[in-house]
Amino acid sequence: MDSLVVLVLCLSCLLLLSLWRQSSGRGKLPPGPTPLPVIGNILQIGIKDISKSLTNLSKVYGPVFTLYFGLKPIVVLHGYEAVKEALIDLGEEFSGRGIFPLAERANRGFGIVFSNGKKWKEIRRFSLMTLRNFGMGKRSIEDRVQEEARCLVEELRKTKASPCDPTFILGCAPCNVICSIIFHKRFDYKDQQFLNLMEKLNENIKILSSPWIQICNNFSPIIDYFPGTHNKLLKNVAFMKSYILEKVKEHQESMDMNNPQDFIDCFLMKMEKEKHNQPSEFTIESLENTAVDLFGAGTETTSTTLRYALLLLLKHPEVTAKVQEEIERVIGRNRSPCMQDRSHMPYTDAVVHEVQRYIDLLPTSLPHAVTCDIKFRNYLIPKGTTILISLTSVLHDNKEFPNPEMFDPHHFLDEGGNFKKSKYFMPFSAGKRICVGEALAGMELFLFLTSILQNFNLKSLVDPKNLDTTPVVNGFASVPPFYQLCFIPV
């Protein structure tokens, strides 16, 4: 009986604490739906499609509103004006990374994606500088992407125009580009180590996009005490870190300090320079996690976009025909596509942009946080508050993009057929937390897609009208449904 009384008292205290925290903070924060004790607004949000729920709530509470995930307040920004004001106009104040408990377990605050403060700034600055020195957006990395595009075309030829699921092959190409940047090595598509790495990356994007992960991140005790797919994700990350550590040891034994070959060499050189400046942010643990982040951000996002792009091109054969006509006119058949071609191919450029806009790969991006107490639109948001960005509300804005739910390359073309930029184009987020590999991803999408369409016609196994382009999961990332196609050599 005594234990029951204690339990009831504990629960009562928890409920009172929950109510007090919510009521004391709500006077400062933007308005929002009334949260339930302990669980907050979790029942009012469709976990399978958070973005749709945010759109519905914005119609009631406006472009800036507050939700509670458990006891934790989260300020939501919906629509271009609110997102721009926060991420661009007040970029420094909104540059923090929001709480992501599962990532905390995986990387302990290291790396480039989930770190904060001085650690994040130094690692991000170093990573950007190193990638630029190796030619991100310049010639040397373009050579690597072109080489991988040629290998991709050869792998597709091996399908002999038979029906195939493109998931694996389209994942190999961007993964190999990242391998060449980090390890100075590309792998054969049949290499077992490479296959294991690909498998872990593919599993992780599916797990991260599941409703279960949303629950884990908002009720963090689940991570330590409950079984579930989150444990598989943590094991996959541990596998990748151990693999990278092996490569780091190989580099330490063979590195030429006067001739760095890749990202690992550059990081080890930085560690050597910083060894007298303790404590340094440049450690082996930081290198492991930064490399894992580059793999995660640079492989599955690009391969998922490529997979979605081919599905949309199957669905819209008239678009595919126009792209192939432009390829034939500008590039021809006797040389590989290059980035200089893009400025002469406005329709193809528009298609690449429209694919990214339409699929809305990361509907709410990753959570941000404010780095200080900030007054925002007459609300006071306390330091450390998590900020949720609705990228969907920007990419699918119906004023900027008429009929935003329709796939239409003319969203990025003017009346004369010239490519038209849009400030609403934010597939990689915006501001200080914009994806480090934005330029690389854009290069890969253009070169891989043009190389495929230069060499193959795409054949659907069903009537294009019957192809479903609805994402199968739409949590962290929008993942396309399973499909097969035939690559018919031109």
Curated annotation (Swiss-Prot):
Changing residue 359 to T: In allele CYP2C9*4. Keywords: Endoplasmic reticulum, Heme, Iron, Lipid metabolism, Membrane, Metal-binding, Microsome, Monooxygenase, Oxidoreductase, Steroid metabolism, Sterol metabolism. The keyword Hydrolase does not apply. Its cofactor is heme. Induction: By rifampicin. Its main location: endoplasmic reticulum. GO terms for biological process: amide metabolic process; cholesterol metabolic process; epoxygenase P450 pathway; estrogen metabolic process; icosanoid biosynthetic process; long-chain fatty acid biosynthetic process; monocarboxylic acid metabolic process; monoterpenoid metabolic process. Changing residue 19 to I: In allele CYP2C9*7. Changing residue 144 to C: In allele CYP2C9*2. It is found in: Endoplasmic reticulum membrane; Microsome membrane. The keyword Repeat does not apply. It catalyses: an organic molecule + reduced [NADPH--hemoprotein reductase] + O2 = an alcohol + oxidized [NADPH--hemoprotein reductase] + H2O + H(+); (5Z,8Z,11Z,14Z)-eicosatetraenoate + reduced [NADPH--hemoprotein reductase] + O2 = (8R,9S)-epoxy-(5Z,11Z,14Z)-eicosatrienoate + oxidized [NADPH--hemoprotein reductase] + H2O + H(+); (5Z,8Z,11Z,14Z)-eicosatetraenoate + reduced [NADPH--hemoprotein reductase] + O2 = (8S,9R)-epoxy-(5Z,11Z,14Z)-eicosatrienoate + oxidized [NADPH--hemoprotein reductase] + H2O + H(+); (5Z,8Z,11Z,14Z)-eicosatetraenoate + reduced [NADPH--hemoprotein reductase] + O2 = (11R,12S)-epoxy-(5Z,8Z,14Z)-eicosatrienoate + oxidized [NADPH--hemoprotein reductase] + H2O + H(+). SUPFAM superfamilies: Cytochrome P450 (SSF48264). It is an enzyme of class 1 (oxidoreductase). It is a peripheral membrane protein. A cytochrome P450 monooxygenase involved in the metabolism of various endogenous substrates, including fatty acids and steroids. Mechanistically, uses molecular oxygen inserting one oxygen atom into a substrate, and reducing the second into a water molecule, with two electrons provided by NADPH via cytochrome P450 reductase (NADPH--hemoprotein reductase). Catalyzes the epoxidation of double bonds of polyunsaturated fatty acids (PUFA). Catalyzes the hydroxylation of carbon-hydrogen bonds. PANTHER family: CYTOCHROME P450 2C9 (PTHR24300:SF400), CYTOCHROME P450 508A4-RELATED (PTHR24300). This is Cytochrome P450 2C9. It comes from Homo sapiens (Human). The gene is CYP2C9.
